[in-house]
């Protein structure tokens, strides 16, 4: 019985120690994540966003060339609107007095 216990001790030691060691694949994956995260952060941090608001009388408000709609607002307490062709806000209620669009574009 003592001999069996002595034989099992090295096996148990290997099982325990193998869990604490980092495998080569894990180390490589961690390094790839670090480098990729750094590159992505640098790329994103250099991008700017330019936004402006446009307001028009009636039920349509169109963004300037190169800008896209990011949000719409309507007068007369109307909450129903849609975006047309990615550049124009359309308020769907009858008799709209004004329509607003928030327009943005990416700046490198």
Swiss-Prot record:
Entry keyword set: Diabetes mellitus, Disulfide bond, Hormone, Obesity, Secreted, Signal
An individual GO BP term: response to mechanical stimulus
Pfam family, any one: Resistin
UniProt keyword Disulfide bond present: yes
InterPro entries xrefs: RELM, Resistin-like_sf
Domain of life: Eukaryota
A single GO molecular function term of this UniProt record: hormone activity
Coiled coil regions, renumbered to chain: none
Main location per the UniProt record: secreted
Role summary: Hormone that seems to suppress insulin ability to stimulate glucose uptake into adipose cells. Potentially links obesity to diabetes. Promotes chemotaxis in myeloid cells.
Protein name as catalogued: Resistin
Species assigned in the record: Homo sapiens (Human)
